[in-house]
Each structure stands twice: as C-alpha cells, then as structure tokens.
C-alpha cells in the first residue's frame, strides 16, 4: 500500500489565464503564492499557484478545460451570506445556493470555464 499523507495541490485547467487570474485573485480574493510562471518549453502556457490555508490551489492554461463535470474544489469562507452576495453582484453563475446540512452550509458556483466551486461554511460543532 502507498502511504499518501496529504493532497499536494489541486489544479484547474483554464482557457484564458488573465480572466482566470482576475476571477480567483480579485473576485474570490485568493492570495497569489508567488508562483506565476510561464511553463518552460510551452510558450504562452502558465501555471499560477495560490496558498489557501495548508493547501495549494493552481490554475493553468497548459490544457483546455473539458466543459464536462469533473473535479470540484471547496473554499471555506468566514461569511457565506456576504460571499454569495458578492458573487451574485459580479454575475457569477450559481448551480445551487442556500444548501444546508447538519455540519455546513454552502453554495455551488462555476468559474468562467465551467469548473465547479463550492463556497462553504462549516457550522460550529455542538461541543464548542
């Protein structure tokens, strides 16, 4: 058995790197990690990383998005209602919103390339 200790990173393929950078940095507020490089040997293809807590999220135009259902990333937010309002104001496409479970509340959106994103807020546990 292989001992997998953590997820190293999640990457989303994007068709327009500038548009994706604007969406993730300016709208969602992800802080760039400093890795924003053209991929060696692939002119015009970029890899951009964001540090989100203990995880790394990346975008790249090295391959085309499929437009089909695929992986999704969930971003934890401090204020779900405010995040949803800001995303609506920006015209972001919502797949679902106001989803409530015993442990969390969330909304499902897509980025400009149709990649799925969950905007998520954990509920305080009963023992806190």
Regions found by a protein language model. Give the residues of each.
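Vicinal oxygen chelate
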Residues: 1-3, 7-16, 35, 48-51, 62-128
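Short polar/acidic secondary-structure junctions
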Residues: 38-40, 62-65, 99-100
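Generic preference for hydrophobic
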Residues: 57-59, 119
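A generic local structural motif
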Residues: 45, 59-62, 94
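Core segments of cupin and vicinal oxygen chelate
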Residues: 2-5, 11-55
């Amino acid at each position: 058995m292989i001992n997998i200790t953590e997820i190293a990173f999640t990457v989303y393929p994007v068709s327009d790197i500038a548009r994706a950078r604007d969406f993730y940095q300016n709208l969602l507020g992800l802080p760039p990690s400093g890795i924003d490089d053209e991929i060696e040997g692939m002119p015009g293809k970029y890899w951009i990383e964001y540090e989100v807590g203990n995880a790394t999220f990346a975008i790249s135009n090295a391959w085309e998005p499929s437009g089909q259902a695929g992986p999704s990333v969930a971003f934890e937010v401090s204020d779900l209602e405010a995040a949803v309002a800001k995303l609506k104001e920006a015209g972001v496409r919502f797949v679902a919103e106001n989803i409530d479970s015993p442990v969390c509340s969330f909304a499902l959106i897509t980025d400009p390339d149709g990649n799925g994103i969950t905007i998520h807020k954990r509920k305080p546990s009963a023992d806190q």
